[in-house]
């Protein structure tokens, strides 16, 4: 560098850089309308000063872009050039025009890069001071909401809705409730797939044992019947009448992926089928799925048919505690029966001479014992754990004896006691998962009337991500083998999930935060032998006598000899 070369003062250099960022940032932001409770879209129209670079020949567009460099009008938020169509309307569509920052002076070369000034001299480009117009449609939902909500209260409310089909579900509390109409309208305007916005009036389950909640339609059409896809399956239900949480999709996938071909699974509080249907469709589990809510049951029946797993998922409509015991009895009764599943599309030709892609029919034998129970009713599912006491009393010979080696003749063919997955809430977050686990363990022990202990705590979201990454690596390796790029030895072993439990040991897994002081957990454990084989008391209460009588009637009923069927008393 020559001694005569002027060196820019670092302070001036920083100031110049700051202006390049702040000036367009201020220009392109939505106008402030703090306190706007009724959305006025016209109020967001604003005029901004710019310099328009008119390019004479389209072949010079890239050259002008490069020459303009730092004086391009960029949106600092998304780091892209502002679209001329956005600023200049029809003229921006019809001509080769690029917007520049207003600090560029049309007749002052010192305010622009030298290369751009040279192109002007060559008559390749012409600079014109020009006003641009921005309207409501040009601003994102975050910008609009930031401009109307109190600055000290805005916390990303635009991200705070759950999308269920065409419905956006909001939870608005405190001062935000005063802006509910404006917030709802912005959400429906800025999200093309949203046709209805609803807000929860009361907490889930506050007025219904079915986990439904009273809701208010804030914007859009009054239609709560939704159709959506989740976990590779399709669902249809009335969002106002059943429970559904789209944020649990990863958890649905995680548990469904624990199931294997031919496993008998009991989904005690199945809802419309988000655990049961993926477990059957993707992993060929045989799922006995129950929900007490009649609307959930009817939706589940439709969803089972729509996903073509009618022979694999058996919907029921009864009390969960009753279902645990009756389904276990019925499973034992029907053990050994064959279930046939056709994996081919309904309309596919069944002649292999015509259809080269025809898959063979799959057959599964009904086992004597459920491999796992799923209990997704976090507010009260743990209260149903007492139904497992004595569930297999008198049937000890069906199960492996921990004191014997699996090499003992006949021992390996016996069953292991089922794994229980029960969901619950706790006030502690993931940061205090050990404290949460202690409290949950005490509660579970109480309902089982057996001293459980915590073997491990887990972040289930991390486990799911890791398992999906491992599955992706495995699939990529298999593709490489098929294409001849890799040998079969390059395929990694399928990742195994740790489902080993000591007697009375349990894992407590963090699922998600529901509220600042409320988190959802999944407790998993193998049913302790002492609980499973516990002999019932000799004296039964009146309610227990009634249930025993109902069981006897159901198990003897000629109408229920065809399994599966709708369990009703």
Residue ranges and their predicted role:
Residues 1-569:
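SAM-dependent transferase fold signal centered on methyltransferase-like domains
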